Amino acid sequence: MPRFVELSHQIVPGMKTYPGLPEPTVEVLLDYEASHKRYQNQAEFYIASLHLCGNTGTYVDSPRHRYRDGVDLAGIGLERLANLPIVTIDATGGGLAIDGDAFRDLDLSDRAVLFRSDFSKRWGTAAYFIDNPFLTAAAAELLVSKRTAFVGIDSLNIDDTGDPSRPAHTRLLGAGIPICEHMTNLQALPASGARLHAVPIAWVGGATFPVRAYAIVDQD
């Protein structure tokens, strides 16, 4: 049987994903007790509204996140978000800047390339918001040249937050490659032999949105 691996952080009211962005809140519209009258004590239901920023938890960036005329979430083809063969890149042994040396000789065409830094171990602490691993501009350029379908990282940002030009976002999204940030559990994935599913809602005009990303690992 295949093995499923959770790759997303849970969304909890009050959680902080990125400095300066609002935290998610929940508004209960109908609770179990209040629903008794509506359904004449024959059934009970719970309905709530979740208020969140698109950049909450583990989320996917569409090209619209970087470009005014870029493809929005609803416009990303499912072939770039689901059933993608995964190539996991171990980036735990170097410094903060991840260059192309670890994947220069790999076939990445039509694959999801996930960069494992183990930075996700800091999730939920103040340390998560400083000194994050990131892709260099050259690494992003190499990913584009290799016709990568999807790029993910278990870090605060795929870019160096000290660089306002955001070269990785600029190059990857400019090439139509979705980005997934704040991933987790990448250490549970093999270098190859797994498939990724990371589909956001089909939000027309939306630029970013949380996903429940997961991998299916072939056990054969």
List each language-model region with its residue ranges:
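Active-/binding-site microenvironments in catalytic and ligand-binding cores
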Residues: 1-220
